[in-house]
Amino acid sequence: SKHSKPSKHSKHSKPSKHSKPSKHSKPEKCGSAMKRTEAAKCARKNGRFNSKRCTCTSVGKPSKPSKHSKPSKHSKPSKHSKPSKHSKPSKHSKPSKHSKPEKCGSAMKRTEAAKCARKNGRFNSKRCTCTSVGKPSKPSKHSKPSKHSKPSKHSKPSKHSKPSKHSKPEKCGSAMKRTEAAKCARKNGRFNSKRSTCNSVGKPSKPSKH
């Protein structure tokens, strides 16, 4: 009939407390699919995943895995987790403009040596530094003089770093000879390969330190 009322037990029949696990309950049994899901969530939070207990332990404190837990953006990475986007780069990743790189690769050495040769400084391959001195440095194989060469950011040129037009280099290698000969040719002078000097037409040049 229309007015038939359901039994008392039908209205008040509520599911038992243990039928549906709450959001924060720990799953007693954790399958392979559940483990992969929880492990992925735990990795995002940079925590440690315990496959036996199927729990995610954050750095320092164990956390209860929840279905709706979202990893925070500013979570600190643990030693064994993948580095997050906000992890600070290491000291050696990108050297700043004024910092001296501790480790200097072969490509870096060639670049710095070329810059140092242009300024007639001394290049220290161990420390990867260019010391500006009045005396010319030993030229590197890859140093090519350019008209628009800019001094490197790591070294501060001193007053005596740039030799005058008529200065005599004490040691003149094959690369330095080519460089000096090219400069001398631009001035329409005569280049002496033995003394590595450029004599202007008619008068020999006098060396000056400044």
Swiss-Prot record:
Biased composition range(s): Basic and acidic residues: 25-41, 99-115, 167-183
Q: Which domain of life is it from?
A: Eukaryota
Return the sequence repeat spans: 1-3, 4-6, 7-9, 10-12, 13-15, 16-18, 19-21, 22-24, 25-27, 63-65, 66-68, 69-71, 72-74, 75-77, 78-80, 81-83, 84-86, 87-89, 90-92, 93-95, 96-98, 99-101, 137-139, 140-142, 143-145, 146-148, 149-151, 152-154, 155-157, 158-160, 161-163, 164-166, 167-169, 205-207, 208-210
Segments of this protein annotated with the region 9 X 3 AA tandem repeats of S-K-[HP]: 1-27
Q: Where is this region: 11 X 3 AA tandem repeats of S-K-[HP]?
A: 137-169
UniProt-annotated stretches for the region Disordered: 1-210
Q: Which GO terms describe its cellular component?
A: extracellular region
Region labeled 13 X 3 AA tandem repeats of S-K-[HP] — which residues? 63-101
Record's subcellular location? Secreted
Mainly resides where? secreted
Which portions of the chain have biased composition (kind: Basic residues)? 1-24, 42-51, 64-98, 116-125, 138-166, 184-193
Q: Where is this region: 2 X 3 AA tandem repeats of S-K-[HP]?
A: 205-210
Can the keyword Repeat be found in this entry's annotation? Answer: yes
Going by the UniProt record, its keywords in alphabetical order are: Repeat, Secreted
Tissue expression profile of the protein:
Salivary gland.
Query: What function does this protein fulfil?
Result: Used by the larvae to construct a supramolecular structure, the larval tube.
- Name of the protein in its database record: Balbiani ring protein 2
Q: Which gene encodes it?
A: BR2
